[in-house]
């Protein structure tokens, strides 16, 4: 720990005696980078959690496979159009582009997303040290401690470990670079100017560019312009000359009213070589001699400083003051004009509207009482400062009951607000009193870096969508770190050596505690489960964290636990419409589910998902018209909700209202062009409607939008199979296996192999499918069927018999057993299996017809021809198009010598299958027999 310690007498240090830190810049940078990596190294193992899912995984502007479109500059951070009424209006296109670059270079691997965040945090830490060294402390040791405190502070965990926190981290980096560029643009060598001229327009323009980039990464980046201007105003870079009778400021030659330079200002260029950044001067030097300044009186503003300020702002010398202020005014006019333009652009691209938030997001802003809003907003400022001072309780979400409203002036929490107000007032007075002394710029810089970046989150100018958000403290924490280290150095200077050593040891301990806390917080951000569970443990009175944890549990299929946390959320916040809606989806009792949906709609009549769920429930109850109305309402209030379009269109198609279904699908694709599910469902509809060519295009679009959409890939394979393009079908099935090697994908591939005679490959595929889902009856039955065809009848019989023991009413099992026994020439067992199948009394006449036909075959094999004929007769009675049964009946009559009857049956079968060679051969045989009989009769007659 390197803290400089001034002379205890409080004397002013000479510029030439600037203390230096023993650390070389490279060593300090290595230590800071190492500390940052040690604290956040564990976050590299994290997955996409919380807002990452919506900003990256589900964001159409970020998703891999989607083309890079100009719409990225018209959409918000989550991929919605900024003009959309449901948009959060968070315009961060450069941050979104950084996500796209991540995906382009390394794919959707979260490791590299986290790695970029950690690297950016390291860079911010290093640039902060450089900034503090060159413009704030002019002391490398203090700058190092400031940056080290910033590097390990636990409140940064959300910004660094959460991938969407990149907006804050990258904006902070650009914020610092813009500030440094602004300082670099000032003339550091104008020895007598109260306000330096703009020496480098390039760096001034670069500052504007970097500040704009910071704003396009996150909105708070725009506050750098305010920091630059106020810092420029209150820390002028002229060189102060302290004379016994006052101070004189040198103006440029030829300027009216310019005093002559004093003897102490004879070597301005020598001084300018010593310091690149602002030099020491005062506004007091711009005027006539001032009264001698007495020794420090303990009052924050000395009489000399106050006299200087009064003379600057009033009196007969205002003309000279304005002349000295001219360089600053030029810069200020440029910056303010530029900020006005980009703010106008920002409002224009939002459609001139502000985001709409709910009471859950920011309860205080919905209070009807001005006093409640004022007291709560004020207390939240103190609460945020407390998070910086003592980051003990940290949580990813502070909404809905985390911080109760401050509704009365007698609330004890107002003491924290008053204390903060007093401290900020004293610090502000200190800045005003010491604005003419270089050694007191630390407090000014600390306050500016603390206050300005927090203004957009303060509810001062507009309502924000959160109560407290730890990641928005990433930028303001720079100011806190500067003030903390400055106060530490002042304390150290006023203590004895022993006291200073104890203070430094305490600081080291604090840094170690902060580091440990940061490492532990990183573990929380590793997965959705650990994050959401930590919220419940940290803020059990927060309804939102219970709701989020319940959502996670529902996704994991842990429904009982999910129901418990949904109900807990409702106890804490009974007006939580989404919790009621989700609770309804988990309830098995349809009446209870309907009650939950209706309650949700009473609280929020435009809740599109509750409308959707209630509509589907009524659809299942065959209340078609009510369901259609609710689904249309769901689309009305959620035009980007793709599931509602699919559900409504499928319902209309079931009602044979195909034109309306087509229109709904078209509207859905127009409003949700990036929904792969919607394209897939529309393709299924087109196949059923007889437009397979159009369906191919939508299947391919679904796959392009989501290459991992294995359902669309399999459906496309099935479509090609139905079109007879088996090679293409096999290609798509194999592609689906690369995405998801599941039984659902293996099954159609096995069927393709079986139906094309590739039985060995079919057997391998079905064996793998059964190993993945051994309990699925259809797969085991298909495997048994392949085994039977390949002659492995014993194994086939074993599998089929096992299925029958589990499901005695398995009709297909009995049919397969009959085929297996027939192949084994156990016709009695085959007949017995068919009899059992007939006893199940299937409803489909064609199925019964096939069973009678099979029974007839087994009877015929046992030479029970009359009974076989009866079975065939029963088959054709149920299904007159059963050509094989007609032919077999003809064959029996043929064998029995009833040739006339046989011919009738053969001819009936031939009408059904006119190209049957077997029938023609049988008829030819019958003709020959009849001719022989005729010849025999003729010979007998002769």
Swiss-Prot record:
Pathway of action: Protein modification; protein glycosylation
The protein's Enzyme Commission number: 2.4.1.109
Residue intervals annotated with topology Cytoplasmic: 1-20, 131-140, 181-196, 353-373, 436-441, 485-498
Catalyzed reactions: a di-trans,poly-cis-dolichyl beta-D-mannosyl phosphate + L-seryl-[protein] = 3-O-(alpha-D-mannosyl)-L-seryl-[protein] + a di-trans,poly-cis-dolichyl phosphate + H(+); a di-trans,poly-cis-dolichyl beta-D-mannosyl phosphate + L-threonyl-[protein] = 3-O-(alpha-D-mannosyl)-L-threonyl-[protein] + a di-trans,poly-cis-dolichyl phosphate + H(+)
GO molecular function terms listed in the Swiss-Prot or TrEMBL record: dolichyl-phosphate-mannose-protein mannosyltransferase activity
TPR repeats: 543-576, 577-607, 608-641, 642-675, 676-709, 710-742, 743-776, 777-810, 811-844, 849-882, 883-916
Gene3D superfamilies xrefs: Tetratricopeptide repeat domain
SUPFAM superfamilies found in the cross-reference section: TPR-like (SSF48452)
Protein topology in the membrane: Multi-pass membrane protein
Extracellular side, ranges: 42-109, 158-159, 218-331, 395-414, 463, 520-942
One GO CC annotation: mitochondrion
Subunit annotation: May interact with FAM168B.
Family to which this protein belongs: Belongs to the TMTC family.
Identification of the protein by name: Protein O-mannosyl-transferase TMTC1
């Amino acid at each position: 720990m390197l803290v400089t310690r001034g002379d205890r007498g409080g004397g002013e240090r000479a510029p030439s005696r600037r203390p230096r830190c023993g650390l070389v810049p490279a060593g300090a940078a290595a230590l800071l980078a190492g500390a940052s990596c040690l604290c956040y190294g564990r976050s590299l193992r994290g997955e996409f959690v919380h807002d990452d899912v919506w900003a990256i995984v589900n964001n159409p502007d970020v998703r891999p496979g989607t083309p890079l479109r100009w719409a990225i500059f018209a959409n918000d951070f989550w991929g919605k159009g900024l003009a959309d009424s449901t948009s959060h209006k968070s315009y961060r296109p450069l941050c979104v582009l950084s996500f796209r670059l991540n995906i382009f270079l390394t794919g959707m691997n979260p490791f590299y997303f986290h790695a970029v965040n950690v690297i950016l945090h390291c860079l911010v830490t290093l640039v902060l040290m450089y900034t503090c060294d060159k413009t704030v402390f002019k002391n490398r040791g203090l700058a190092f401690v400031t940056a080290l405190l910033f590097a390990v502070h636990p409140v940064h965990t959300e910004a660094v470990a959460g991938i969407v926190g990149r907006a804050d981290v990258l904006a902070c980096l650009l914020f610092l670079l813009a500030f440094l560029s602004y300082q670099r643009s000032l003339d550091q060598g104008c020895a007598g100017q109260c306000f330096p001229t703009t020496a480098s327009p390039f760096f001034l323009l670069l500052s504007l560019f970097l500040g704009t980039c910071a704003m396009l990464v996150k909105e708070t980046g725009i506050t750098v312009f305010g920091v630059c201007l106020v810092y420029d105003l209150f820390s002028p870079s002229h060189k102060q000359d302290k004379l016994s009778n006052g101070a004189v400021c040198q103006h440029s030659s030829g300027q009216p009213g310019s005093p002559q330079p004093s003897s102490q200002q004879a070597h301005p260029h020598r001084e300018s070589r010593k310091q690149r950044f602002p030099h020491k001067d005062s506004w007091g030097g711009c005027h006539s001699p001032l009264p001698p300044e007495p020794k420090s009186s303990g009052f924050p503003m000395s009489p000399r400083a106050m006299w200087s300020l009064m003379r600057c702002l009033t009196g007969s010398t205002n003309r000279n003051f304005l002349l000295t202020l001219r360089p600053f005014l030029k810069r200020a006019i440029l910056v303010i004009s530029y900020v006005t333009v980009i703010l106008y652009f920002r409002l224009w691209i939002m459609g001139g509207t502000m985001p709409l938030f709910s009471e859950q997001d920011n309860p205080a802003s919905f209070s009807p009482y001005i006093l409640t809003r004022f007291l709560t907003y004020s207390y939240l400022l103190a609460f945020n400062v407390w998070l910086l001072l003592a980051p003990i309780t940290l949580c990813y979400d502070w909404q809905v009951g985390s911080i109760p409203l401050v509704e009365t002036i007698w609330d004890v929490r107002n003491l924290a607000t008053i204390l903060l107000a007093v401290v900020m007032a004293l610090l502000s007075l200190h800045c005003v009193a010491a604005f003419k002394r270089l050694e007191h710029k630390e407090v000014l810089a600390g306050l500016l870096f603390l206050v300005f970046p927090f203004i957009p989150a303060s509810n001062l100018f507009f309502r924000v969508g959160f109560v407290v958000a730890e990641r928005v403290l990433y930028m303001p924490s720079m100011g806190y770190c500067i003030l903390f280290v400055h106060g530490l150095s002042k304390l150290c200077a006023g203590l004895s050596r022993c006291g200073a050593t104890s203070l430094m040891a305490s600081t080291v301990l604090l840094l170690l505690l902060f580091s440990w806390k940061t490492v532990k917080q990183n573990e929380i951000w590793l997965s959705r489960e650990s994050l959401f569970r930590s919220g419940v443990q940290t803020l059990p009175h927060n309804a939102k964290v219970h709701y989020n944890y319940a959502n996670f549990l529902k996704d994991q299929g842990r429904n009982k636990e999910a129901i418990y946390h949904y109900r807990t959320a409702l106890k804490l916040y009974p007006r939580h419409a989404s919790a009621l809606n989700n609770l309804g989806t988990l309830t098995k009792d349809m009446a209870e589910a309907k009650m939950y949906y209706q309650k949700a709609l009473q609280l929020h009549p435009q809740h599109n998902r509750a409308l959707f769920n209630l509509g589907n429930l009524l659809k299942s109850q065959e209340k078609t018209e009510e369901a259609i109305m609710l689904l249309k309402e769901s689309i009305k209030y959620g035009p980007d909700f793709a599931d509602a379009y699919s559900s409504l269109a499928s319902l209309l198609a079931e009602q044979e209202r195909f034109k309306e279904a087509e229109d709904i699908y078209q509207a859905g694709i127009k409003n949700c062009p990036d929904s792969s599910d919607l394209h897939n469902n529309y393709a299924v509809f087109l196949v059923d409607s007889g437009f397979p060519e159009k369906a191919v295009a939508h299947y391919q679009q679904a796959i392009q939008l989501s290459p991992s959409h294995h359902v669309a890939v399999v459906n496309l394979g099935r479509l090609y199979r139905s079109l007879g393009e088996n090679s293409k079908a096999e290609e798509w099935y194999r592609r689906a296996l690369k995405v998801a090697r599941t039984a659902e994908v293996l099954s159609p591939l096995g069927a393709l192999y079986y139906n094309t005679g590739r039985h060995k490959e079919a057997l391998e595929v079905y064996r793998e499918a059964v190993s993945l889902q051994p309990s699925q009856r259809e797969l085991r039955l298909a495997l048994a069927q392949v085994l039977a065809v390949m002659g492995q009848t014993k194994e086939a019989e074993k599998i089929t018999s096992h299925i029958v023991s589990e499901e005695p009413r398995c009709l297909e099992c009995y049919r397969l057993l009959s085929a297996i026994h027939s192949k084994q020439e156990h016709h009695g067992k085959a007949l017995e299996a068919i009899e059992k199948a007939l006893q199940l009394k299937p409803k489909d006449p064609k199925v019964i017809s096939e069973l009678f036909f099979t029974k007839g075959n087994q009877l015929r094999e046992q030479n029970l021809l009359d009974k076989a004929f009866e079975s065939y007769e029963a088959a054709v009675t149920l299904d007159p198009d059963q050509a094989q049964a007609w032919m077999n009946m003809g064959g029996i009559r043929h064998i029995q010598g009833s040739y006339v009857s046989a011919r009738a049956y053969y001819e009936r079968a031939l009408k059904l299958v006119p190209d049957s060679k077997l029938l023609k051969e049988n008829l030819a045989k019958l003709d020959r027999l009849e001719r022989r009989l005729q010849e025999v009769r003729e010979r007998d007659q002769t």
